[in-house]
A protein has these predicted regions:
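Extracytoplasmic gating/loop element in the C-terminal half of outer-membrane beta-barrel translocons
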Residues: 332, 651, 867, 931-942
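A generic beta-sheet turn/junction motif
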Residues: 34-36, 45-47, 64-65, 363-367, ...
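Extracellular/periplasmic, surface-exposed regions of secreted and cell-surface proteins
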Residues: 129-132, 168, 175-176, 182, ...
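Switch/connector loops and helix/strand junctions flanking conserved nucleotide-binding motifs
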Residues: 114-116, 212-214, 232-233, 246-249, ...
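A surface-exposed, glycine/aromatic-enriched loop/edge motif typical of exported proteins
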Residues: 251, 256-323, 414-474, 586-594, ...
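Outer-membrane beta-barrel transmembrane strand signature
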Residues: 294-295, 299, 303-362, 369-373, ...
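A generic structural motif
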Residues: 128, 378-382, 650-652, 802-804, ...
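Short, small/polar-rich motifs associated with maturation and membrane association
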Residues: 1-394, 399-402, 406-408, 414, ...
Length: 942
């Protein structure tokens, strides 16, 4: 008996040893279609928990038996299975998941499978962000997303553009989208984010996507996800970029020839005198005399030609005397001067250098993953004295402490410095270099020169600029007198320097198998110090011997989120339920002071000037928002999808009795291509999906304390007094946006052609409008909820890959948007004027009327040139009693011209297109934005 037991044990042991002996070391690699190794791919023995991941070059090693099956997978690629058999080396090439139907996209408070998403969203990957070569992350959206418009407000390096998502949403309550960085609202400067740190940007455009963010997401949401470690191997990246900034948009065909400029002005003067009753000969003589006289006589103020003695400057034929030479030497008040024109545009702008350096390291060790980066950017503007420096550092750590516990943190630090010119915006003031150089005539000098033509200097070694105020041989400009924008840009100082910190942290706790609780916390702190110095030598502050201003601003945000998720799969049914709470606090603190009479411009501190301008001040702004929210997502068999969300929001910008608002959304989708009756299309149709959503959101973006009366504290003969500032309205509450979205997504021929078409409708009701009142009431206006607006349109996105081979790929993309905007209702108090059957009100050169788009131009309309060479404008004819006759006539007197509706700036079609070719790792790409239709008013050109 004992012998039998012993033999049986030996037999079992032999079988075990035999089975173990059958396992052997399998080596291999995992690569993509281009032959590049895939880092972090999972290699798993099917039916077991035994597995490994591929290394930095895609290689792997695993023990497996001949009858085992290996499953190789990686996100974005189709899984691959292979039986081990007798092989000792297995090389796998993974195919891209061209349908991308299982891609995960970032949505409100989490992620979702793209196929299950019922809303409207566009994702921009890191590769496209880096290719755009932008300093500001917002610029990476240009031309990439249907329905999104970007407008640059200045040429300052790093300046954030204005962004519109699906048109204007309000008359007074703002249009800016909400920015989310790693799940947390972000109100800091977008220029503090390094584009090289960004993994993806997702633009959410409809109520199903945005309603969980309540009021702050009413104008759309842009979600930024930063990079994290993707593989166990350490991955180090270093890149350096150099480029040149140059002026891309040139001027119109302005007159740049001094002789032609004089001739045209002479012609205008001559025609004026002829129309006043002079003979042609008399008009010719008077025009020659007054051509270079001061502005009171209709002259240009400057004579920059030398004309032979006894000869006329302009002949009877209206042409400059061919014997006249450019440049003029003269003596004025005992000093010799040489007067000649300068090229102001050439002096104002330059081709400048842009240089950027980035380094990052990432990897996983044990249960921890780490990503760290450092970046430096130096970007010089196209205008002198405009530039920026930015240093960024980021550290992200994620740690899986237990199977049920995960936590992590993500911190970003930025140090920045800007130099900018005084006025770089869209205005046409005398301090704006861009407007100045196009408006100033080609006859005017930039500098004051001595009799030899050398630029003169003052006692401090500063070049003498010509301010057109008589300092240059007594000559005075008729346009922009006592100003020189180029001098201001060179000698004045506008500097900002500061630090920004943005940090987020999270804790995930999984329990009872199907539940997960998440706590998120985010904090943002921006500190900016500004210095403004106006030079003591020239310009409007020369009499005060210069002026220095100091400013400091702190922007602090705190956001806390508590989220509970329940996820369950029962057969073909999948359900996710989310409940959450969010609180948001924003605090802004400012401090400023100004002094004049500087000892020296080099000392730009307040202690370096002696006269207190009594301009010191400070203020604090507080804003609080709290919300409770819920969402349910359901799908059946991966074909039918539904979602519903609800948020109850409170805002400190409203009276306590009206602070809470309720917002919701419903969405559904159907993947038709998965139906059995579509089986005949399986070979060429990858994906066909119908979707629709509806919902509402609020908007509270009107500033603080509009619901209560406010007062200012002033100095009244050395005593403190309060002065009424603004009238409050207790009854104001949320402006509401109701959204409808319907669309179709498609993909053909294994991803060769893909895209989507969407229709959207957004109605804004209870618009927050500012009501002007009579000045005798002691305040200028108050806010109320009145007025409606409508935006509707169609978006189209198309992607085409005509070539996809092992070593080469060619991609083409196109998007377009057609948008219509209309004010549908205004209160009777604002319908103060009737124009062409439309009721509304006038603000500056804009008419806001029922039935018209926002910002419809209302101004004088040019009618051409009269037979006498005079400019003409249209006017409404009236009879002898002043009653309108209904006829439109012309006039040469600008003051008598009538105002008319002249169109609006909203384009009929806008979007972007581009193409990229990748060959063996070398990439060539170009991208364009376009706009068809829409009007712009250029006051400088007019």
């Amino acid at each position: 008996m004992t012998k039998k037991i012993f033999l049986s044990l030996m037999a079992v042991l032999g079988l075990l040893l035999s089975a173990h002996a059958q396992e052997r070391e399998i080596t291999g690699s995992v690569k993509d279609h281009a032959g590049a190794g895939i880092v972090g791919a999972t290699i798993l023995v099917e039916g077991t928990t035994k597995g490994t991941t591929s290394g930095a070059d895609g290689s792997f090693s695993i023990k497996a038996a001949p009858d085992n099956v290996l499953v190789v997978s990686f996100m974005g690629y189709q899984s691959h299975t292979i039986k081990v058999g007798t092989q000792t080396r297995i090389d796998v090439v993974l195919k891209e998941n061209t349908q991308a139907i299982d891609d995960v996209i970032v949505v409100a408070f989490g992620t979702a499978k793209k196929e299950a998403f019922t809303g409207s969203a566009t994702v921009i990957k890191s590769d496209d962000i880096v290719k755009s070569q932008q300093s500001n992350v917002a610029q990476a959206l240009a031309g990439k997303v249907a329905g999104v418009q970007l407008t640059n407000t200045s040429g300052q390096p790093g300046e954030s553009p204005k962004i519109l998502i699906r048109g204007f949403s309000s008359l007074n309550a703002g249009h800016d989208p909400l920015w989310i960085v790693d799940g947390m609202p972000y109100s800091g400067d977008l220029n503090n984010l390094n584009p090289s740190d960004i993994e993806s940007m997702t633009v959410l455009k409809d109520a199903a996507s945005n309603s969980l963010y309540g009021a702050r997401g009413a104008n759309g949401v842009v979600m930024i996800t930063t990079k994290k470690a993707k593989s166990q191997e350490a991955h180090v990246t270093i890149d350096a970029k150099w480029g040149v900034n140059s002026r891309a948009v040139q001027d119109y065909a302005y007159i740049t020839n001094p002789a032609q400029f004089y001739e045209l002005h002479y012609s205008a003067l001559k025609n004026y005198y002829v129309n006043s009753g002079m003979s042609i000969g008399e008009a010719h003589l008077r025009a020659n005399t007054n051509l270079t006289a001061n502005a009171n006589d209709g002259g240009l103020g400057y004579m920059v030609y030398t004309v032979p003695s006894g000869q006329e400057f302009i002949g009877i034929n209206g042409k400059v005397n061919p014997a006249a030479t450019l440049g003029r030497r003269l003596v004025y008040e005992g000093k010799e001067y040489y007067i000649r024109p300068d090229d102001w545009t050439d002096a104002a702008f330059r081709s400048s250098l842009r240089q950027e350096y980035n380094a990052s390291i990432s990897g996983q060790t044990g249960n921890a993953s780490i990503y760290g980066s450092f970046g430096y950017l130096n970007n010089e503007g196209i205008a002198y004295n405009s530039d920026m420096d930015r240093y960024t550092a980021r550290l992200r750590v994620d740690y899986q402490a237990k199977k049920w516990l995960k936590f992590g943190a993500n911190a970003n630090y930025t140090h920045f410095r800007y130099n900018q010119i005084d006025d770089s915006g869209a205005g046409n003031s005398s301090g704006n270099v861009f407007a100045y150089t196009t408006a100033v005539g080609p006859i005017y000098p930039l500098y004051i020169r001595d009799g030899e033509g050398n630029v003169m200097y003052n006692e401090d070694g500063i070049k003498l600029y010509d301010y057109g105020n008589g300092d240059n041989a007594g000559m005075e400009r008729s346009l922009f007198p006592n100003s020189n924008a180029l001098s201001d840009s060179r000698l004045n100082k506008q500097e900002a320097e500061g630090n920004a910190f943005n940090g987020t942290g999270y804790i995930d706790v999984t329990f009872l198998k199907d539940f997960k609780f998440t706590f998120n916390a985010g904090v943002s702190l921006d500190e900016t110090r500004s210095t403004s110095v106006t030079n003591p030598w020239f310009g409007q502050f020369a009499s005060e011997k210069g002026m220095v201003s100091k400013g400091h601003q702190r922007n602090f945000d705190l956001n806390l989120q508590q989220i509970l998720n329940y996820t369950k799969q029962i057969g073909s049914h999948n359900i996710n339920v989310m409940l959450g709470h969010e609180s948001y606090q924003n605090r802004i603190y400012t401090l400023s002071a100004t002094k004049s009479n500087m000892l020296t411009q080099e000392n730009d501190e307040l202690a370096g000037a002696i006269i207190d301008k009594q301009g010191a001040g400070s203020y604090r702004v507080e804003y609080n928002n709290e919300g409770y929210f819920a969402r349910v997502m359901y799908d059946y068999a991966g074909k039918y999808f539904a979602s519903a969300s609800y948020r109850r929001d409170a805002s400190s910008r409203f009276h306590p009795d009206h602070r809470w608002g309720n917002f919701w959304s419903l969405g559904g989708a159907w993947i038709i291509s998965k139906e059995n009756f579509m089986e005949s299309t399986y070979e060429w149709l990858d994906n066909l999906k119908l979707k629709a959503s509806i919902g509402s959101q609020g908007n509270d973006n009107i500033g603080n304390f509009r619901y209560t009366n406010t007062y200012t504290i002033e100095n009244a003969n050395g005593k403190v007094s309060t002065v009424f500032n603004a009238k409050g309205s207790e009854n104001i509450t949320w402006e509401t946006n109701s959204n409808f979205n319907a669309g179709v997504e498609f993909s053909f021929l294994r991803g060769t052609v893909s895209g989507g078409v969407e229709y959207f409708l957004r109605k804004t009701t209870d618009m927050l409008l500012s009501f002007p009142v009579a000045p005798s009431l002691g305040y200028s206006s108050y806010y109320a909820n009145v007025g409606d607006m409508r935006n509707s349109g169609v978006e189209i996105e198309l992607n085409f890959t005509p070539i996809r081979r092992e070593h080469v790929q060619w991609d083409i993309n196109l998007n377009m948007t057609h948008l219509r905007n209309k004010i549908t209702m205004l209160p009777s108090e604002r319908r103060t004027k009737q124009v062409d059957g439309y009721s509304g009100y006038v603000s500056g050169s804009t008419f806001f009327g029922e039935g018209l788009p926002m910002y419809t131009f209302y101004m004088r309309k040019y009618a051409g040139v009269s037979d006498e060479g005079l400019s003409m404008w249209y006017m409404n004819e009236t009879d002898d009693k002043g009653n309108p006759t209904g006829k439109r006539v012309t006039t040469t007197e600008y003051a008598k011209a009538s105002d008319y509706l002249c169109g609006d700036p909203i384009p009929d079609l806008y979007g972007g297109f581009g193409t990229s070719v990748n060959f063996r790792g070398f990439d060539l790409s170009v991208a364009f934005t376009y706009q068809i239709g829409g009007l712009a008013y250029d006051s400088g050109y007019s």
